[in-house]
């Protein structure tokens, strides 16, 4: 599933629209980054297209009009890069790690990965081709915990919604999602020995008609200002 959003509501016939395909977990920081970038680059509108990294990689492979692609994992960026669809090598611009999320108030008193194996607990994730689903499987394997998920959501936002609404008891998401939830769910830390480092690469699509603006957007994210913005939303610097 792909969600599209403009970073600002201003309209101008002279504007260049920069199509940024970004992982769902980047929704909030990229929305703010888009607004900040537009202020520094009059005449450029940042159009965010959000979805699971696996879906976005497939869209780019199928010729979608993307200028920039930001993935929540290296594997999906590699799919694009291996087909020579990038203008230059991708770069890591942020990292993330995982947390368990539970319904506000933690009614089932979940405190560890082992608690997630309770057969009466409703656990949701995504398919393993979506980065958060793949990372979740890696974490559970490290911890020696076996779980049969009750449902598979299309992306990390789906996991958040299911748990926040009480339709599910628990899930595993990025730390940045817990920050963005602003108290709608509770986060439970996963020990470092079981956790992973999710690397977020970004690349410019080779057939972009706006290479200059695309490079400027990437440079903005890598700048101290862009990195501070990402950190504000729970991401780590690479």
Predicted features along the sequence, with ranges:
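A short, gly/pro- and small-residue-rich
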Residues: 83-90
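Conserved beta-strand core positions
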Residues: 18, 44-46, 98
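Short secondary-structure junction motifs
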Residues: 41-45, 88, 182
């Amino acid at each position: 599933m792909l969600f599209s959003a403009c970073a600002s509501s201003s309209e101008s016939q002279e504007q260049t629209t920069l199509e940024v395909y970004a992982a769902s977990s980047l929704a909030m920081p990229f929305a703010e980054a888009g607004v900040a970038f537009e202020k520094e680059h009059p005449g450029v509108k940042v159009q965010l297209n959000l979805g699971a990294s696996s879906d976005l990689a497939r869209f780019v492979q199928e010729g979608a009009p993307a200028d920039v692609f930001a993935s929540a994992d290296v594997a999906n960026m590699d799919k694009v890069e291996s087909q020579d669809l990038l203008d230059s090598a991708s770069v890591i611009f942020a990292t993330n790690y995982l947390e368990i999320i539970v319904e506000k108030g933690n009614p089932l008193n979940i405190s560890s990965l082992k608690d997630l194996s309770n057969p009466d607990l409703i656990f949701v994730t995504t398919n393993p081709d979506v980065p958060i689903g793949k990372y979740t499987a890696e974490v559970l394997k490290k911890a020696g915990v076996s779980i049969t998920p009750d449902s598979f959501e299309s992306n990390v936002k789906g996991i958040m919604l299911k748990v926040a609404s009480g339709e599910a008891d628990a899930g595993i998401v990025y730390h940045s999602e817990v920050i963005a939830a602003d108290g709608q769910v509770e986060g439970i830390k996963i020990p470092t020995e079981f956790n992973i480092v999710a690397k977020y690469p970004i690349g410019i699509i080779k057939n972009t008609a706006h290479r200059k603006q695309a490079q400027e957007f990437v440079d903005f994210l890598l700048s101290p200002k862009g990195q501070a913005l990402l950190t504000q939303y729970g991401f780590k610097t690479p």
